[in-house]
Curated annotation (Swiss-Prot):
Expressed in heart and skeletal muscle. Residues 167-185 have a biased composition (Basic and acidic residues). A motif (SH3-binding) lies at residues 124-130. This is SH3 domain-binding glutamic acid-rich protein. The lineage of its organism: Eukaryota, Metazoa, Chordata, Craniata, Vertebrata. Keywords: SH3-binding. The gene is SH3BGR. GO terms for molecular function: SH3 domain binding. GO terms for cellular component: cytoplasm. Residues 198-239 have a biased composition (Acidic residues). Gene3D superfamilies: Glutaredoxin. Transmembrane segments: none annotated. Belongs to the SH3BGR family. The keyword Ligase does not apply. Residues 159-239 are annotated as: Disordered.
């Protein structure tokens, strides 16, 4: 009888708690009853906006976004050309970026002007687009971008880690190999120079030796002539 009463009253209690009713035979086993109740719990992200599917805390993924401030309606051909070059380069290299127009959005214009460092602003204090940021970190203007691109340090300029197969890493490796080859070539090139120098020094020493020998021979000849001249008067006196 107690089992029957439990079976009759348990469905009512479960319905009141917004849980599915269980069979009378399952109510006798607490493990089965709990197993039947668990499937009604809503574990979706909507029910737990700050938690994961299993109720764990969600940690936001930090993703750096490159911001390029442009003026789409600029009347300057030079500015439009610079903007197109920056945007085209980022697209060609599959670098994610966000294009922000300052011509039609006062907030974008104000934010750009306030976040460009003072030493990077022109004399009138109004920086011209394109201006490049990594989130809130200032990267530079077009001139800085162009220099970084020419030196192949664009990822460092943007504050991004270069991909493994990027041209920057390849250029660094090639640069190291080129420097090593250049040093080796310089060492090899120095050998003939050293040999030539030694040969020149040897020739110079030989010439000096020959000159000294010639001078010595001339000196001896002069002494012999003087001796001969000194002997001739004596012979005349004897005769």
């Amino acid at each position: 009888m107690p089992l029957l009463l439990l079976g009759e009253t348990e469905p009512l209690k479960l319905e009141r708690d917004c849980r599915s009713p269980v069979d009378p035979w399952a109510a006798a086993s607490p493990d089965l009853a709990l197993a039947c109740l668990c499937h009604c719990q809503d574990l979706s992200s909507g029910a737990f906006p700050d938690r994961g599917v299993l109720g764990g805390v969600l940690f936001p993924t930090v993703e750096m976004v490159i911001k390029v401030f442009v003026a789409t309606s600029s009347g300057s051909i030079a500015i439009r050309k610079k903007q197109q070059e920056v945007v085209g380069f980022l697209e060609a290299n599959k670098i994610d970026f966000k294009e922000l127009d300052i011509a039609g959005d006062e907030d974008n214009r104000r934010w750009m002007r306030e976040n460009v460092p003072g030493e990077k602003k022109p004399q009138n204090g109004i920086p011209l687009p394109p201006q490049i940021f990594n989130e809130e970190q200032y990267c530079g203007d077009f001139d800085s971008f162009f220099s970084a691109k020419e030196e192949n340090i664009i990822y460092s300029f943007l504050g991004l880690a270069p991909p493994p197969d990027s041209k920057g890493s390849e250029k660094a490796e090639e640069g190291g190999e080129t420097e090593a080859q250049k040093e080796g070539s310089e060492d090899v090139g120095n050998l003939p120079e050293a040999q030539e120098k030694n040969e020149e020094e040897g020739e110079t020493a030989t010439e000096e030796t020959e000159e000294i020998a010639m001078e010595g021979a001339e000196g001896e000849a002069e002494e012999e002539e003087e001796t001969a001249e000194g002997e001739e008067p004596g012979e005349d006196e004897d005769s």
